[in-house]
Amino acid sequence: MITIVLLILAYLLGSIPSGLWIGQVFFQINLREHGSGNTGTTNTFRILGKKAGMATFVIDFFKGTLATLLPIIFHLQGVSPLIFGLLAVIGHTFPIFAGFKGGKAVATSAGVIFGFAPIFCLYLAIIFFGALYLGSMISLSSVTASIAAVIGVLLFPLFGFILSNYDSLFITIILALASLIIIRHKDNIARIKNKTENLVPWGLNLTHQDPKK
């Protein structure tokens, strides 16, 4: 019974639409009506500012981490922490508290990985910020980190680097999360190809995007 309760709790944690609620409560702004219409970290930064964007990221990240740690906190046996983390990501993407219309799963997925394999998460953070500096696009960085996650989980155990052994469930979860993130960014990918993707005011913009085009 406790397992079912905690699995439901993991989904509910993921379903907390932090950006949407922060906008409505503190700014009287519905993020769905502004910018990209997304309720995640990037649109929150763009529409509501740095403080709101950072708060959204922290909440979205650590709700994934907390969900992943639930079975450890409650000394639950028999169900991998990754299953709880996956449910949090599903909740974030399809939140019951926001009409099942959620974010793009990046921050919460990162939080899940941090809760299960923190050094692997650090590797992905380096990839993410490296890609962000080179391309000046959150979307490109997210997709790049997703691809790097798949490459890492498949190759690193072979060399005993960061991941000491192959974990079939971890590989499956990484493949699922990476696929979800890439699918959720399909519109962004199209804009990147057309050189019209939104930029952040940092980095080299080596792909020469022109969002005003």
Curated annotation (Swiss-Prot):
Organism this protein belongs to: Streptococcus pneumoniae (strain Hungary19A-6)
What are the recorded Gene Ontology BP terms? phospholipid biosynthetic process
What the entry lists under InterPro entries is as follows: G3P_acylTferase_PlsY
Name this polypeptide is given: Glycerol-3-phosphate acyltransferase
Assembly, in brief, is: Probably interacts with PlsX.
Q: How does it sit in the membrane?
A: Multi-pass membrane protein
PANTHER family per the UniProt record, alphabetical: GLYCEROL-3-PHOSPHATE ACYLTRANSFERASE-RELATED (PTHR30309:SF0), INNER MEMBRANE PROTEIN YGIH (PTHR30309)
Give a GO cellular-component term.
plasma membrane
The protein's annotated catalytic reaction(s) are: an acyl phosphate + sn-glycerol 3-phosphate = a 1-acyl-sn-glycero-3-phosphate + phosphate
Q: What is this protein's gene name?
A: plsY
Q: Does the keyword Transit peptide apply?
A: no
Q: What is its main location?
A: membrane
Recite the UniProt keywords alphabetically. Answer: Cell membrane, Lipid biosynthesis, Lipid metabolism, Membrane, Phospholipid biosynthesis, Phospholipid metabolism, Transferase, Transmembrane, Transmembrane helix
The places in or outside the cell where this protein is found are:
Cell membrane
Main enzyme class: transferase
- Positions of transmembrane segments: 2-22, 52-74, 81-100, 112-132, 143-163, 164-184
Q: In which pathway does it act?
A: Lipid metabolism; phospholipid metabolism
Pfam families tied to this protein: G3P_acyltransf
